[in-house]
Amino acid sequence: MVEPLLSGIVLGLIVVTLAGLFYAAYKQYKRPNELGG
């Protein structure tokens, strides 16, 4: 049974990606003019 492991990896990647996007958006919201962004 490889499906549970595969689905777990996919969910983990999705969570990490969303967390990274929210973190970047939060930093950009807190300091909008830093590093030309």
From Swiss-Prot:
SUPFAM superfamilies: PetG subunit of the cytochrome b6f complex
Domain of life, source organism: Bacteria
GO annotation, cellular component aspect: cytochrome b6f complex; plasma membrane-derived thylakoid membrane
Subcellular location: Cellular thylakoid membrane
Membrane is among the record's keywords: yes
Gene Ontology terms for molecular function: electron transporter, transferring electrons within cytochrome b6/f complex of photosystem II activity
Name under which the protein is recorded: Cytochrome b6-f complex subunit 5
Originating species: Nostoc sp. (strain PCC 7120 / SAG 25.82 / UTEX 2576)
High-level lineage: Bacteria, Bacillati, Cyanobacteriota, Cyanophyceae, Nostocales
Gene: petG
